[in-house]
Structures are given as C-alpha cells and as structure tokens.
Amino acid sequence: AVMTPRVAGWEGVVFQPVRAPAEGVRTRRLSPLMLAETFLDRLERLGPRYNAVVTITRDRALAQARRAEAEIPTGRYRGPLHRIPYGAKDLLATSGGIPTTWGAAPFKDRVFDFDATAILRLEAAGAVLCAKLAMVELAGGMGYRQPNAAFTGPGVNPWNRDAWSGGSSSGSGSAVAAGLVPFAIGSETWGSILSPAGHCGIAGLRPTYGRVSRHGAMALCWTLDKLGPLALTADDCGLVLEAIAGRDPVDPTTADRPYRYPGGGPAGRRFRFGVLRDITDGCEPEVRDNFARSLDVLKGLGTVDEVTMADLPYDDITRTILFAEASSAFEDLIESGGIAGLTAPEDRYTAYARDAILAKDYLKSLRLRGVMAREADRVLARLDALVAPGRATVAAMLGTEVRSAIRGTARDMMGAVGNGAGLPGLAVPNGFGARGLPTSLQFMGRAWEENTILAVACAYQSATDWHRHHPEEF
C-alpha cells in the first residue's frame, strides 16, 4: 500500500524532500520549533512500532530549534539543513548525558562526554538532532544471522510489519521510510547503508572511504568503516554529505579533499553506465524484472554496456579483512567474555572463530585489495557508474535466517568491491517485489566522484516516481 503525504497542518512536512521544509524555514513560513515538535511527536508515537529508536533527544532538539527561532529573523541562515530534524545511528557519540549504546545490551547505559565529528558538523549546519536510532548490536560485527540482534528488538520494515528493515543501520532505514525523521546518519562496513535503504524504499549513500570523519563513531573495521546519509532522495543525500564531509585533524584517515554538492547535475547530460555480466544471478524474479525495467530508463539517460572484471576472490578479500579487524577492534569484549551479554545467541560465540585468522591471510588480503581497487578503477575509468540491483532479494521476514555475503551465504560482488576498494555507492528505490516490499537500484562510481553518482541517481529519480511512494502507518 502507498500513501500520498498529507498536506494539511504541520504533518504536511512529513515525506517531503529536505529542500521543501528548508525553504519554508528560510522564508519563515515554517517554525523550526514546530518542525522539531512534529518529528519528535512521530518518533515518540510511532518509533516503538518499528523498534527504530533508542533515545529521543527531545531537550537537545528543542534547545537547538529555539536558537533557530532567534537566528533566522536576524538573517543568520546556515543553509538547506538549517533546523531540519534528523536521527543518528547509535554508534555516534553524543554528549549531554545521551546514551551511546552501539545497539548492544552491555552498553545500554553508557554515555560519553563529547560529540562525534559528524554530529558536530551537522549542528554547525543547523540540523536538529532528534533521536539516536537503533542498530544491529556492534554493527553486526559479531556475526549475527537473524534480525533479532539488538536489545531494542528487530528492525521492523515500515512496508510490512512482519519484515526486517535491514542491517546494521536498521533504525535509520525504518525511521526515514516511516517519516519519523527527514534524514538519518548510518554507517557501512559492508552493506549497512545500502541494505536498509534498499529494503525500506529510500535513498542511501555510502561515501568514499576517508570522505567523512569517523571520530566518535564505534570502530568495527578500521579500513572499511564509512559514515553516510539515508534520506528520501538522492538529492537529500548530497545535501547531507556536504555538511558532514571534509578533513578532520582527529581522524587521520580523512582526506584533505574539500567537498561541495552542486545539486543534481546539468540537465540533459548523457551518462555512461556499465553492468557486470551475470550480476543478477541469484536475484529474486521481481528483483531481476525491476532491474531490467530500470535499465530501460537508464538507456534513455545514456548508454548501457556490459562489462567484465578480472576473476578475483572479491568477497573473500573483503570478508577476511573485515573478520580480522573486527576481532581486533572488539578484542577486550571478546576475551573478557563480555559478548555473553549480547542479544543474538550466535553473537556470543561466532567471534571466537575469527581469532583463528592467520596474519599471513590478512596481509595477503590487504595486498589483493590493491589489485581489486586497480581493477575496479580500470573498469570505472570509462564509465559514470556501474549499476546493479541494490539487493538480490527483498527484505527478509522476521524470525528467519538472513542471507549474508559477509558470512558467505550470499554473493555480493558490488558490495565486496565497493567496500573493499572504498568506492562510493548509492541505492535508490526502483519498484516493489514479493509481499509488497521495495526493491532497489545501486550505482557505484570511482573514488571521490560522489557527485557523479548523485547526478546519475537524481536523473533516474527525475524519470521515475518510486521515491514518492510511502508506506501507510500501522
């Protein structure tokens, strides 16, 4: 079922792309305080239905909104995110007594005395933090196999109460799709932004590794982790990325590459798309059908050519790096036996097996990652984007086992290459599949070329209306 956003009263700002309420705030037709109240109400009233929220930051949000009431009349307008409410995945540190739980029961009362850089940059852009959003415990780093792997319960998909919203940024996906916040910040090590975005019918952007500071974010895998936005449209993702991107002296992995988002790109531009041979193998029939229809749309926007990549163990390379670094990142928790307090039973023992990864295998994977990155760049050098189904299947049903490329029970060449080589990727909705659940289309580009795939995705969304479909409340 789909709904048309209501236009009467303050609820009329729900399911609107960021630029709409931003213009209302700028012209003083919308009160920042009432805007915050609208989404705080939805978070409090609807958040529990989706297991989407860990902590509602009402006091902080209202204080920020009140400051905006005083700033805007004086002409101090900070840009399109000025006083736009948002939520942050609960692996980003927040001060002021707001817990940062990492989705894990052993840390549910833990607080920090500082804010993550991404939180500070959004505050500087004028955005209003309304909630810390639920996530799979420890961002899935302990090897979970089913949706119920968080002390807040499984992420519920707003399109079907019996389906999962996807991991590990489950609350971010649910909250945006259900209209609880206009945008959210998630993280991806392998699939944790693109998966909930695709399963929930919204847009999700994985930036180039090093584009966004991870200072104050939980570390799962130092050489794979990335922070990025989930929002209603690709254009929204670009606006948010501009706010959070940039070098950070306290995160030495960030690159000294200033980033500006120019908008959707020049009208009438022709793009060059590539499709990897056999990329739809293993996809559900509806996913394949929707991808084929998406390719027809893309052929109206440019050229679509089949491409091939060298035969390398892409999944194994990225999987070995992830497993080895995760076992190191959580060494104290694992060796102390603290993982016994996690929610998913398999998370209490799977991590021990990863301690058996040999140093020579980790180092071999790091060396092969360089080969993988060069091969990906060879293919992408003559393209604007590689395109593929966002996910091979629609969202899993609650209570079932989740197929995962990370565990080797599913294939995800795009995810392995994109995350292993640190390349930007973007998922947008492209239809519906089994049980009325969304399917998605993903674009992957060269390192540092987020604006190219954003332009591609904006062009696709200008030619389709899947991003205007929203779930009914339940």
What are these regions (language model features)?
Residues 1-63, 300, 469-474:
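An N-terminal boundary/leader segment
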Residues 20-27, 87, 106-111, 225-232, ...:
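Short, well-ordered beta-strand elements within core beta-sheets of diverse protein domains
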Residues 29, 33-36, 44-112:
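N-terminal, positively charged, Ser/Thr/Ala/Gly-biased leader segments
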